[in-house]
Structure formats: C-alpha cells, structure tokens
Amino acid sequence: MKEIRILSATGILGSGFREETLKRAMGLEPHFIGADSGSTDPGPHYLGSGDTLFSDSAYKRDLRLMLLAGRAAKIPVIVGSACTSGSDPQLERLVGIARDIAREEKLSFKLAAIHSEQDKGYLKRKLREGKITPLANAPDFDEGVIDRSAHIVGMAGIEPFVEALEHGAEVVIAGRSSDTSIFSAMPVMRGLNPATVWHAAKILECGAACVVLRKYPDCNFAIVRDDHFIVEPPNPEYRCDPDSVASHNLYENSTPYELVEPSGVLNTYSARYEAISDRAVKVSGSTFKTAERYTIKLEGAELAGYQAIIIGSVRDPIILRQLDSWLADLTKAAKDRIAAVYGAGIEGTYRLDVRVFGKNATMGPLESETAIGHEVGLLFQVTADSQERATALMKSVSHIAVHYPVPEWTGLITSIAYPYSPAEIPRGPSYRFNMNHVVAPASPMEMFSIDYENVGH
C-alpha cells in the first residue's frame, strides 16, 4: 500500500520541540520533515517591519536539529512562511541561518528558496485587469493601498514546493505559504489522494497541537495513505483521541468542515475519526473539490503611525462605580490639554485610545459580563505620525490621568497607580493589515520565484 510518512517538527519554527521526540520520530522513517515558520496570529507588525517573532538563536536551534536529522536520513526538510511573515527580508534571514548551520556542522545540500513577496507593479496590473477580488469583510483596496504597503506577500500553494522538490532540492525554505501546503506537496506529488493529504496536512500543520493536552510544543507524526491517515504523536507523554484531532479543524478556521486552499477546497463534513489505540487516531472520508479558478491570497501591512502607551491601575471604589463616565471625562480633558499645548490643528493627527483590563479589554462591546472586580488595569495608547509626537502627547495624558478627580473627593487626588517610571512607554512603529483579497494568476507559479543554491559544497 502506497504511503507517505510525515514528521511535523513543531507548530512554528522557533517555538521548540524536544530533541528526544525528534529522534524517536526519525526511527519511524519519515519521508520528509516539515515545519511552518509563520503566522498572522502575532499581528501585522512582523509583515510590516520585517522583524521576527523569535530570536535567531531560537530559529537556529530548531533548524539545526531538523537539518542534522534530515541530512543523516537523506530526506528533505521543508519550511514555510520563513521567520513569521515570509517577506523577502525574512526569507533571506532564515536562509542565512541555514547557511550558518551548514558551515558549522559541515553539511552540504541543495537549497531552494521560494520567494513570496509581490512586485507592486505586478499587483497594480492585476488590479486593472480585474484579477484581484475581495474576500469577506475586506477593506477598500486600490493602487494607493499597494503603494502604502511596507510588504505584500502571496500565500503559496503546493506548486512552488513541488517544483523545488522535482528540481532535487534537499532543503526547501519558502516565503509566505499556506501552512498545509508544506505538508501536502510531497504526498500530492507522489500521487496520493488529495483529500486525504490535505486533511492530514491540516492536522499536522501545528505540530503537536492536535493532542489531548499540549503542555509544550513538540513533534507530530502521520502515516498518509490513499483512503485514510493515522496520526500518532511520537512523544510518549502525548496522545490523540478523535475529539482532539477533529477539533483541530477549527483552529484558525471559520468552519470545521471546509478548508480553502489555492487549488481547491477540502471538505471534512463526512470525515470519520476512529481511535485505533489509546494514542492514535485514524481519519478517513474527507473530499477535495478542485477550484474552478486558482487564486492566491494576499497579505499586506502598512504603517499606521507610532505609538506610546501608559499602563496603570485603579482601585478606588468610588472611581470604579463611575468608571465609564470618569474615563470619558478624562479623555476629553486630555484632548483639551493637548489642543491647548499644540493648537487646534493637532486634532485629527493622533488617536487616543483606552482599554480597561478587568472590564471588557478582551471582547470589547461583545462582552456580556458587566461585573467589575475590586480593581481594573488601564492601558492608554496614543498613535501619532512620529514617535516624538506620540511620546510627547502621552506625557500630557499621563499627568491629566494620574490626578483626574471625581466629585466625591475634594482636593487633589491620585487616581491611577503607575508601575513604571517614566509612565509613558514608547512602542515604536505600529502597522495594520490592509488587505483581505485574492489574486487570480495566469499560472500557479506566476507569483513565485525560486532560487537554488548548493550550500556547503
């Protein structure tokens, strides 16, 4: 029976895995080692700035173990969404780390670097041709959005990975790509049923995340065959059951029954999850419908401004009883003070926001719980067109806030406790995601290029 054995090293490169688990998994003779290295979960900063979620040391530790294991077994190592967002600077950063490891460990391999960063001129042409369309709740999109974007990436499907593997790449490091494409490319290339492959890839994408209780990041392992796959964690402390595996279909997904990929849609409505031991689950019954139109999702981020924040807490029960009105009056007083210092023209050039921890900081207006405890935390945030301006405005806010009165108290009061001195904390540049759109390329490879390199030879 044809099968592909897949080792998922971890949920996101840099978050770690246990070395002994990797060794145990290698004893199961995987056909390749894969790991995602990115996500939009940490927000737009990483795509906008090119920074990375983890340190170079964290990436190097994980990638070193993967490369050593992969080269010893002569199997490919495949990494997607390099260094968080998969932009060109982040791709080059991870490729550089791979080169350093090869030099230090005296390894040699053929490396494929898949570029996902998009040319702005190309996107403008596609926009004029009507080849860029919005997804649900997409913001407005025009050439100005393209121009303002610090980086724009396309989320690659399996095709760039397949091309790299067919060209003999032993290590593949990709820019932005769908998490599942990392694990689907080789099995689909080898002719396995796409429905089974894509479903297995969805379960493997986050390493050990589909176990019953994941206490720390670690490896996962699956055997993929035409009509089913079996997932069993190589860490003996972990186990999967049907509920833990099935529930992972909801992770980063609006529905547990459909997963949209560039080439089609995985449907898990008829999937069956069967415990074949106290640690392993057999999954079968999914279907895959090929898309009528091949599309690539775009991700972009633009500079929203520069921020400064203040963290404080309020414990006075008199203030807490009238917290909403007190904060509204405080905010108005702070804005009036800013206008007095900088002139009326300052209005509209900055934003002052307040978040209340212990009231509705997580859910905002969707919060159903109305009770407030004995204290709350406050986060004041100013966003302006420069760091100097944001910090300066926050200095005015901090002084107004710390002594803002309530009618029940006479004289000067101190209403907020600040844990830091100075109270205002510069946060640097702040970015926002600015697109939720797909492109219809002329071919699956039109938006991606691959650089090949013989490393260590």
Provide a role label for each language-model segment.
Residues S108-K126, F357-K359, A417-R427:
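Short, conserved secondary-structure transition motifs
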Residues G27-H45, L68-A73:
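N-terminal glycine-rich anion-binding loops that anchor highly charged ligand groups
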Residues T52, I75-G86, V171-V172, G377-T383:
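Short glycine-rich or small-residue beta-strand-to-loop segments that form or flank ligand, phosphate
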Residues Y294-H457:
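C-terminal non-catalytic interaction/assembly regions of soluble proteins
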Residues M1-A9, S15, G34, P76, ...:
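Small-residue-enriched flexible segments
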Residues D119-A174:
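An acidic, phosphate/nucleotide-engaging active-site surface
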